């Protein structure tokens, strides 16, 4: 393949690892956060909230755009129309509304855990009002995020279970209206503990009001497979699920002489290799979820992309603009 191997600054934050010890807890059964379980009945059109699309003069309301992945913003390429905008989560439709069309659905945690962030000011994030819950699993911490809430009924530090209400489904945040009200759900790995220092180095001119639970610091994977497991009461294994995700590109980063902190948080990511590596090779999905970390005896002075899966169009379209080049 032909590619520049350029490593974009936004990805460098993923490689800034900080101390966090794993917690030895049990796996969980992931539950749906609202009464809408249409996905279990093979009715995705009744589960995912559509977006209003106008592509080349043709208007549509595809429910697929409410699913996880590269599902939004079509562009025409030599390979045909390609959705290039990443949607880091799933948008779940409401089931109940009052006479004015305002949704009435309660939002519950997908599993028991601790509220680590509750942002009740809708102007502080594109998420609008949102809540983040930490779930301690055998493989390390899992984070669930619930966004665009009409109201928040929990606070940081609360211990919650699936029977608790953490908020109301709504349409707070950017680009939403009452008709398209939904709850945006993410399941995530946390990338850094000292996110604030990295964020400050970007000099974006806007304060980080969300600490380590800013969306930039949470690498979200598709929640749908985890939700589908609950039909049979199957437990969700974080390590098994992450290990099954497809790798899109691999980054080599210099070793600092100690185990990367991401590996300390998620030990299952570590693969066999030299005991005293000169660098680390981190495999990522196209959406930026780390899948594995492998010790390497190859020296390097700065992070760089060393491999990427070929595509018939720009790598930018399948790596959230993190990797340049094409196949």
What are these regions (language model features)?
Residues 1-11:
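Bacterial N-terminal signal peptides that target proteins for export
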Residues 11-22:
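Bacterial N-terminal signal peptides
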Residues 24-26:
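Boundary at the C-terminal end of the N-terminal hydrophobic targeting segment
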Residues 28-69, 155, 161, 180, ...:
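Acidic, glycine-rich catalytic/binding loops that coordinate metals and/or anionic ligands
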Residues 63-108:
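Short glycine/threonine/proline-enriched tight-turn/helix- or strand-capping micro-motif at secondary-structure
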Residues 87-90, 94-98, 129-155, 193-195, ...:
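Active-site region of chymotrypsin-like
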Residues 102-104, 108-151, 178-180, 184:
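Zn2+-dependent peptidoglycan hydrolase active-site motif and core
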Residues 113-115, 157-169:
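A structural signal for short beta-strand/turn segments enriched in small hydrophobics and glycine
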């Amino acid at each position: 393949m032909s590619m520049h191997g350029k490593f974009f600054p936004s990805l460098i934050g993923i490689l800034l690892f900080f101390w966090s010890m794993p917690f030895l807890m049990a796996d969980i059964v992931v539950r749906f956060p609202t009464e809408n379980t249409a996905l279990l009945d093979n009715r995705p059109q009744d589960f995912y909230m559509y977006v209003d699309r106008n592509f080349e003069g043709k208007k549509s309301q595809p429910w697929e755009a409410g699913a996880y992945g590269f599902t939004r913003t079509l562009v025409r390429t030599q390979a045909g129309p390609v959705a290039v905008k990443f949607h880091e989560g799933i948008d779940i439709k409401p089931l109940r509304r009052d006479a004015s069309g305002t949704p009435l659905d309660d939002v519950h945690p997908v599993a028991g855990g601790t509220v680590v962030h509750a942002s009740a000011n809708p102007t502080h994030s594109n998420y609008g009002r949102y809540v983040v819950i930490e779930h301690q699993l055998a493989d390390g911490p899992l984070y669930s995020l619930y966004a665009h809430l009409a109201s928040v009924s929990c606070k940081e530090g609360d211990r919650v279970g699936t029977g608790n209400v953490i908020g109301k489904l709504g349409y707070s945040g950017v680009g939403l209206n009452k008709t398209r009200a939904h709850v945006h759900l993410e399941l995530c790995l946390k990338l850094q503990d000292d996110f604030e220092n990295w964020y400050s180095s970007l000099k974006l001119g806007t304060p980080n009001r969300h600490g380590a639970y800013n969306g930039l610091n949470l690498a979200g994977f598709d929640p749908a497979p985890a939700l589908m497991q609950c039909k049979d009461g199957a437990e969700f294994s974080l390590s098994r699920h992450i290990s099954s995700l497809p790798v899109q590109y691999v980054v080599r980063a210099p070793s600092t002489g100690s185990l990367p902190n991401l590996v300390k948080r998620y030990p299952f990511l570590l693969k066999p290799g030299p005991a005293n590596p000169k660098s680390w090779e981190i495999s990522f999905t196209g959406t930026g979820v780390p899948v594995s970390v492998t010790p390497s005896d190859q020296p390097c002075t700065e992070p760089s992309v060393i491999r990427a899966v070929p595509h018939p169009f720009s790598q930018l379209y399948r790596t959230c603009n993190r990797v340049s080049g094409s196949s």
